[in-house]
């Protein structure tokens, strides 16, 4: 059986581990995109430290959970969003205005929707978290 979307699988695993009260989640296979999404989540205070562990295959991310995540997931399909259209997707994926964040892939790298809006850039929606 092949893995169709490693990012969606990783975020679903984090959400499930968080909901049952685990302190650590192991995400495999590891990828650069998953690492960058974890970096944004760490910068925003949703997860603790995370580290990459080489296992001879695709690698594993060990993520320390701190109990801040209610729900997280990947956005499929990855919608293209202009910098003034974020509010429409906030209403669709987030429970309330100003609560949670959308992670966006922009020409300037991965960032939250608030950072993208203030930088004046659009991009593709990658995931949501609250």
From Swiss-Prot:
Q: Which GO terms describe its molecular function?
A: rRNA binding; structural constituent of ribosome
Q: Which Gene3D superfamilies match?
A: 3.30.1370.30, 3.30.1490.10
UniProt keyword terms in alphabetical order:
Ribonucleoprotein, Ribosomal protein, RNA-binding, rRNA-binding
Write down any Gene Ontology CC term. Answer: ribosome
Swiss-Prot/TrEMBL GO biological process terms: translation
Concerning InterPro entries, the annotation shows: Ribosomal_uS8, Ribosomal_uS8_CS, Ribosomal_uS8_sf
Q: Name one Pfam family in it.
A: Ribosomal_S8
Q: Which cysteines are joined by disulfide bonds?
A: none
* Purpose of the protein: One of the primary rRNA binding proteins, it binds directly to 16S rRNA central domain where it helps coordinate assembly of the platform of the 30S subunit.
Spell out the subunit comment.
Part of the 30S ribosomal subunit.
Name the family the entry cites.
Answer: Belongs to the universal ribosomal protein uS8 family.
What name does this protein carry? Answer: Small ribosomal subunit protein uS8
Q: Which organism is it from?
A: Methanococcus maripaludis (strain C6 / ATCC BAA-1332)
